[in-house]
Amino acid sequence: MPVDSRRLQGPESAFSYTLLEKKDANAEESILSADMQKMLIDSKQIRKDKRKPTDARPLFLRTGIISQAKGSAYIEQGNTKLVCGVYGPREVQKKSDFRLNGQLFCEFKFAPFSCQKRRSHQQDNEELVLSGLLREALEAAVCLHHFPKAQVEVNVMVIENDGSPLAAALTCASLALSSASIPMYDLVVGASVRQLPKVLLLDPTKDEEWQPELSHDQNNSNLTVGYMPSMQQVCAYVHEGVSNTEDLEQMLKLVTEYCLKVQPIVQLCLKETVEKMLANEGENKDAE
């Protein structure tokens, strides 16, 4: 097998193994956890952005952003901003990819200017993983048997990343698919929560998200969930870090309750989209 000798044969990013080394005493880890918690939340249980632990960031939704796409949506969740375009259904080009049911092709991409560190124009490993998670979640909600031998493309672009991009992408992609008249079992609403040793932070920002190089002790994790409220089913479950069963139950309960609150907002946005579509069709008929 040919090998590129000029390329570094190592991971794209790495951190010192000493951060993962277990100490004989747990005093250092407890001090790190306490200091981290003080950085994220003060003694009055108020976060940096003046939110309470169980408060979410302001949410803004809009459809019809991309005129060339069959369906599109835009979401703002605090300073996290994403746009999603849906194209198809289209005939599958490769015979090797032929299937009786329809297929979903999902692409998750960070804009080069979306993060503090400039991102590459080509997809990196993180974006490939997020694309796969997005596809697996949406496949559970889309009626793939309604468009056999065809493919629907879902393209998500992160314009600004301030935390919880996958959760925002799930909500945005679900709204874009609905606006494109793609049959679905239910809408998908995404939510995430950060676990600290003594408190749960709903809808974490970039600074509040779990980081493996800084959070390698127990009861310190991040959970992202894609939830179908009407069917009361979870279609995406991504957990990073270390948590016990009781804490996971509390985290799942918190995010599902938040998804139930967001569902009417998504439905209202979709209702306004349908009303505008019907109004435009009526105007075109009157003009003829």
Tell where the protein language model's regions lie, with residue ranges.
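Polyanion-binding surfaces on beta-sheet-dominated domains and ring/shell assemblies
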Residues: 1-288
